Amino acid sequence: MDVKTLVGEYYASLPSGVLREFVEDPSSREWAYTFLKGRDIVFTRKRRLDEVSGFLELYHSTGKFKNPKSWEGLLGWDLVIDVDAELPEEPEAFLKSLGRLLKDVVIACDELRRALGFPRPDVVNFSGSKGFHVRYFDSTVRRWLRWDLHERRGIKPGEIIQRVGRGVVWLAREGFVAGDRVRALREGLLDDSMYDLKRLIRCVGSMNVKSLLPAVPVWSREGGRWVDFRDEVLGMNDLELGCLVAHRTLTWPGRGGLGVVLSRVLDLDTDADPEDPSDFVEVWGNVMSVLGELKP
């Protein structure tokens, strides 16, 4: 099996509409894709999600526009925080580091709420490679920023985003967001890309071609209360938590998904209990070995 076949089988296994599930008003977004041509990965933009097929990766704009193709008529904006770390390749070390990073994400979200008045996230998802994306949807951002009030005062949407974004980044860099576990906030966790009006972000459910793992949700508002998720995350050891996240990459969205494809097409055993780390680490190591041989 080659990369193109694996990725195609993965997308074909997903239920209809699942790639739009965590995108508010998808018709107002610019969509972008990567394709494999020969040995090169090429990037292209299109107007709508249903305009193309055969892609490797899928991205959408964080902004919402009247005319998405030309980025004109800003209607709203998702705030997305990208939390990355250098994760080791050895399976058990990778899983421990992944679990530790998710704990840092949860603590950082609570600290942003305490120090800067951030709302609760709408979605936290594994990026498919080195970390997590924390997503605040446009509807949440509007309430938080009192968007309608600013518009009545004649402030354009782009100005609202730029003012707030620069202010939040400055506060974080100046140390108003404290705590040893969130020191990364002053080292690039909140950066200028956060309020870039033309920013593109990997779609939840998209494959990440660097790792051949999908970007899957680990928590959403629809899935339960933030406080329960936080307590569960902080109450687990790093390895157990990393196993749960990795297991999610194999089993999401519950019908189809990467694990089903690997089992069906490559006869690879992906059926391991994440609550039994010794068993899961072995299975995960096999998965990483197989995917590593396929990477472009």
Swiss-Prot record:
It comes from the Archaea. The keyword Iron does not apply. Its EC number is 2.7.7.-. One of its GO terms (cellular component) is DNA-directed RNA polymerase complex. GO terms for biological process: DNA replication, synthesis of primer. InterPro entries: DNA_primase_ssu_PriS (IPR023639). One of its GO terms (molecular function) is metal ion binding. Its cofactor is Mg(2+); Mn(2+). The active site is at D82, D84, D191. Keywords: DNA replication, DNA-directed RNA polymerase, Magnesium, Manganese, Metal-binding, Nucleotidyltransferase, Primosome, Transcription, Transferase. The keyword Hydrolase does not apply. Heterodimer of a small subunit (PriS) and a large subunit (PriL). HAMAP family: DNA_primase_sml_arc (MF_00700). Catalytic subunit of DNA primase, an RNA polymerase that catalyzes the synthesis of short RNA molecules used as primers for DNA polymerase during DNA replication. The small subunit contains the primase catalytic core and has DNA synthesis activity on its own. Binding to the large subunit stabilizes and modulates the activity, increasing the rate of DNA synthesis while decreasing the length of the DNA fragments, and conferring RNA synthesis capability. The DNA polymerase activity may enable DNA primase to also catalyze primer extension after primer synthesis. May also play a role in DNA repair. Belongs to the eukaryotic-type primase small subunit family. This is DNA primase small subunit PriS. It comes from Methanopyrus kandleri (strain AV19 / DSM 6324 / JCM 9639 / NBRC 100938). The gene is priS.
